[in-house]
Amino acid sequence: MDISRAEQRILHHLAQGGRIEITREGKTITEIRCFTRDGWVYPGVDLELFRKLKRKRAIRSSAGKPYRITERGVRSELNNR
């Protein structure tokens, strides 16, 4: 799966325990916020990036909870230690 640097940054925050919360007005998404595991808001998420990650099935929401990373969104890496 080819992903851009911006997508990699977001997926990295999510893999460390972050989440993406959305605010809706009816069916329209009005606001998207990415929270790190420490509770800080990461400003690099917009609607286009959110839709790309959703289309690639890298993130998913279950039971109305915030969006989290899926197994498909996590890529394996060698342990360099």
From Swiss-Prot:
Pfam families according to UniProt: YjhX_toxin
InterPro entries according to UniProt: YjhX_toxin
HAMAP family referenced in this protein's UniProt entry, alphabetically: UPF0386
Family, per entry: Belongs to the UPF0386 family.
Protein origin, superkingdom: Bacteria
Species this protein is from: Sinorhizobium medicae (strain WSM419) (Ensifer medicae)
Listed name of the protein: UPF0386 protein Smed_0945
